Amino acid sequence: MKIKSALLTLVGALTVFSSSAHSKDLKIGLSIDDLRLERWQKDRDIFVNKAESMGAKVFVQSANGDDSAQISQIENMINKNIDVLVIIPHNGEVLSNVISEAKKEGIKVLAYDRLINNADLDFYVSFDNEKVGELQAKSIVAVKPEGNYFLMGGSPVDNNAKLFRKGQMKVLDPLIASGKIKVVGDQWVDSWLAEKALQIMENALTANKNNVDAVVASNDATAGGAIQALSAQGLSGKVAISGQDADLAAIKRIVNGSQTMTVYKPITKLADKAAEIAVELGKNEKIEANAELNNGLKNVPAYLLDPIAVDKRNINETVIKDGFHTKESIYH
């Protein structure tokens, strides 16, 4: 009986030890490019809720589009002894050194939505960003199969912006070569800011004497700025224009006819998946990958989700059905 009692005591102690070790809060640092953009506010809320529901603590900081601020914030997170670092980079070219610091401390690193180049990443989660660009260009070509096109790229330091452009040109290059489409301007928008897109579009309209038939804009913020310039010249609704992110303002513009389409990236799926992967990384669990991308240093295992083109015809079946926006907020 004594032996049995001792064994039971030992098992009980081990169970308590195991349980307390398992319940130790996993600490995740979430470094966000710029919370001034509606898009990232949604990602933050969904990610934090999911990670916390899985027993993790999440520390969030926004760099407001500033490289040095993001590096400093990541260093601060490293000093807080986080287990996993999740980064939405402002500039995917400047974080390799600070990521090396994190790795030396045994911290796992997950790139969220945007790939970070030449860095020792553990995993990458995003959408198929070349497909985003293809959807944008295909939608605009369907409305304006010929004419003068203006290409409005995103931030020149955002790797995704380059992938969007790559996808766009897969569709546009044959039409440019055949002469059906003429590119009358091509500019990138620093930090994806609407006010910069407004200035770029104003200058483009002046340079082309308002003779622009379509704008391939890479996201909704830049589309919004461009549409302001088009409206001032009485061209709103006459010039086809793409977007991305399914921002509420953009969906409203699609309803009123000033924006042609947006690309909806089901952010709930992305943020939930990223939170799951972050927790799995922290627990050293095996992670399911469905792709691999080379970032210049290594082949990074990745999980890529499918984006969806949204126009007037399928708003109900996409953003409303998913609860991304309510019918009331869109139509009232």
Curated annotation (Swiss-Prot):
Signal peptide start-end: 1-23
Listed GO biological process terms: D-xylose transmembrane transport
Cross-referenced PANTHER family: D-XYLOSE-BINDING PERIPLASMIC PROTEIN
Keywords, sorted A to Z: Periplasm, Signal, Sugar transport, Transport
Gene: xylF
Domain of life: Bacteria
Family label: Belongs to the bacterial solute-binding protein 2 family.
Matches recorded under Pfam families: Peripla_BP_4
Keyword Magnesium: no
SUPFAM superfamilies found in the cross-reference section: Periplasmic binding protein-like I
Annotated protein name in UniProt: D-xylose-binding periplasmic protein
InterPro entries on file: Bact_Solute-Bind_Prot2, Peripla_BP_I, SBP_2_dom, XylF
An example Gene Ontology molecular-function term: monosaccharide binding
Annotated compartments: Periplasm
A GO term from the CC aspect: outer membrane-bounded periplasmic space
NCBIfam families xrefs: PRK10355.1, xylF
Species assigned in the record: Haemophilus influenzae (strain ATCC 51907 / DSM 11121 / KW20 / Rd)
Biological role stated in the UniProt entry: Involved in the high-affinity D-xylose membrane transport system. Binds with high affinity to xylose.
